[in-house]
From Swiss-Prot:
Transmembrane segments: none annotated. It comes from Mycobacterium tuberculosis (strain ATCC 25618 / H37Rv). Disulfide bonds: none annotated. GO terms for molecular function: ATP binding; glutamate-cysteine ligase activity; ligase activity, forming carbon-nitrogen bonds. Belongs to the glutamate--cysteine ligase type 2 family. YbdK subfamily. Its EC number is 6.3.2.2. InterPro entries: GCL_type2/YbdK_subfam, GCS2, Gln_synth/guanido_kin_cat_dom, YbdK. ATP-dependent carboxylate-amine ligase which exhibits weak glutamate--cysteine ligase activity. It catalyses: L-cysteine + L-glutamate + ATP = gamma-L-glutamyl-L-cysteine + ADP + phosphate + H(+). Keywords: ATP-binding, Ligase, Nucleotide-binding. It holds the Pfam family GCS2. This is Putative glutamate--cysteine ligase 2. GO terms for biological process: modified amino acid biosynthetic process.
Length: 376
């Protein structure tokens, strides 16, 4: 057993402060057809060497990332600084930047894979499901001071999974069809064998043992092949939240980043105060994910281990009030307050459905509306 523990050891870098980082995935769409364009390689080459711009699985996708930031406003400005020049290059090539959880009508069979061994290996292993991953999301990293805090925070954060998914849900379409889901992306992504909800661990050693087993049995070769909706990033010293669908605009992105930041820091501080963080049974967490994906802001979610239920927007109102002091301390009070605008004015999936109805089902109009929302 000691030898196994030594082999399983994973060092967590740790962050002295609850710093913030954001990864924002964009699709490239043709300005005329509004369909996806497999031109990311050329776009990234023209942008040149830039640590803020990354390639992704498919050649229709460009990822914009922030640096290490102290607050939401800093992260949003960092993203803006990269987005402006990048969008100009994209437009000069007859395309637009588009972000939602899925594209309204694009076909997966027309998409090209980025030339990289890890992507080729992913498709070789996952086959049909892997080729279906025509999805885009937002990932938020929050710094955690030490490894022993990561698992309790991650497991407790799952209580807020439906809140984040319902607010960000932006993928009602799949291949031109209305799926009836607010977030079809959430249902698609979990089909990959190492994706979906994380296991409920309380100790870092449990996670180390899990990774050891995954590697020994050939399920993964590297840590980044664990594609959970929330996962540790040991080399960065962060907890990475990957729940949210793609977000079309900076205002909503700022609201969701601020909410994520506040939730994690609140749990972190409660741990410091000696509190045992609340958790729910895995079956409740799984049900909440499905309800939020299916019903979005109309979801009635399970609140606790006692199976109490409540409309997600009603619970969000109380969560936002409770987090106000945390937001002030993190300099994101305005961004957190903007969360309520999302459920008051309508989430992306609701806006998309409304646009489609107003244009007699023409999904090109949905693409145009989402592109127009990206005000830099």
């Amino acid at each position: 057993m000691p030898a196994r523990r030594s082999a399983a050891r994973i060092d967590f870098a740790g962050s002295p402060r609850p710093t913030l980082g954001v990864e924002w995935e964009f699709a490239l769409v043709d300005s005329q057809t509004r369909d996806l364009s497999n031109e990311a390689t050329a776009v990234i080459a023209e942008i040149g060497e830039n640590p803020r711009v990354h390639k992704e699985l498919l050649r229709n996708t460009v990822e914009i990332v922030s640096g290490i930031c102290e607050c939401t406003a800093e992260a949003m400005q960092d993203l803006r600084d990269t987005l402006g020049p990048a969008r100009q290059i994209v437009r000069d090539r007859g395309m637009e930047l588009f972000c939602a959880g899925t594209h309204p009508f694009a076909r997966w069979s027309a998409q090209k894979l980025t030339d990289a061994p890890r992507y080729a290996e992913l498709i070789k292993r996952t086959q049909w499901w892997g080729r279906q991953m025509l999805i885009w999301g937002v990932h938020v990293h929050v710094g955690i001071r030490s490894a022993h805090k990561v698992m309790p925070i991650m497991t407790s954060l799952l209580n807020y999974y439906p809140h984040l998914l319902a607010l960000s849900a932006s993928s009602p379409w799949w291949g031109g069809e209305d799926t009836g889901y607010a977030s079809n992306r959430a249902m698609m992504f979990q089909q990959l064998p190492t994706a979906g909800l994380p296991f409920h661990f309380q100790r870092w050693a449990e996670f180390e043992g899990f990774v050891y087993d995954q590697k020994k049995t050939g399920i993964i070769d590297h840590m980044d092949e664990i594609r959970w909706d929330i996962r540790p990033s040991p080399h960065l010293g962060t907890l990475e939240v990957r729940i949210c669908d793609g977000v079309s605009n900076l205002r909503e992105l700022g609201a969701l980043v601020a909410l994520t930041h506040c939730l994690i820091v609140d749990l972190d501080r409660r741990l410091d105060a000696g509190e045992t963080l609340p958790t729910m049974p895995p079956w409740h967490v799984q049900e909440n994910k499905w309800r939020a994906a299916r019903y979005g802001l109309d979801a009635v979610i399970i609140l606790d281990a006692d199976s109490n239920e409540r409309l997600v927007t009603d619970d969000l109102a109380d969560v936002l009030t409770r987090l106000e002091p945390v937001a002030k301390s993190l300099n994101c009070a305005d961004e957190l307050a903007a969360v309520s605008d999302i459920y008051r004015d309508g989430a992306s999936y609701q806006r998309q459905l409304r646009v489609a109805q107003q244009h007699d089902g023409d999904l090109r109009a949905v693409v145009d509306a989402l592109v127009a929302e990206l005000v830099i």
